[in-house]
Amino acid sequence: MKFGYCTSFDNYPLLDQLGYDYIELAGREVVGLEKSKLNEMEKTLKTGRVKCCGFNSAVPGEIAIVGENYSEETAREYAKKLCAVGGQLGISGIGIGSPASRRLPYGYNVPLADSQAEEFLSIFGEESAPYGIKIFWEHLNPTEGNYGLTWNHGVELVKKVNMENVMMVCDLYHMEVNREFLLDLDQEPSLIGHVHMAQLEGTERRGILPNYRARYEEFIEKLKSLGYDGIISIEAFSGSVDEEAAGSIRLLRELCGMQKA
């Protein structure tokens, strides 16, 4: 497997030094950068060892995925722009999590929300296809939103979209907070397109930590048994990037039997 870390481009040298294979950038931030900055990033990614596997945090809160403010026209306009930037940077995937974009008011029609989410994913699938980019739906947890909170719901959603380049992010952090079973991953394992890991420690979303090694071992063995051999990205929002990134890749190498001497 290959390893990535979700962070800003300023930390590219750090990830290179630590031995990460990929950097994963916040799409909603990258999409607004000036052309000169994007060109500079493109040059670094083309010549450097560490590549950009894709975007997390892809959709800003003002772009609704579901709900009263959802707009097909707005979704397509944003998808065109984001996918073009992704194509320039050579990414392979865009994760659609973005909890602020999928909060429903009390009593909202859930079947309608499902229809909106399907349309949103279809739009992104269509706009990303010319660039060879895959779209990954990410299920969340109740502390972040109120729509799309389980792996099984996400799988059913993606199956309805029925596009080869629309798949799932398998996020252990959300599964743990939701207390979901790894057995749920047996439902359409071919839809696992990308993996995120992080650890809830108190109120902080940290990188992966040695104290939880047994659970990580179980998770990675499950992924292997289902035929997944892709990228695992650490998506931590707390702690210092240098410490979280260093500790996480050290543990990932051990878990995957790739520990350097």
Please tell me what each predicted stretch does:
Residues F9-N11, G27-E29, A58-G61, A100-R102, ...:
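Active-site-proximal loop/turn and secondary-structure-junction residues that shape catalytic pockets
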Residues K37-R49, E119-S128, D184, E218-K222:
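Catalytic-core regions built around general acid/base machinery
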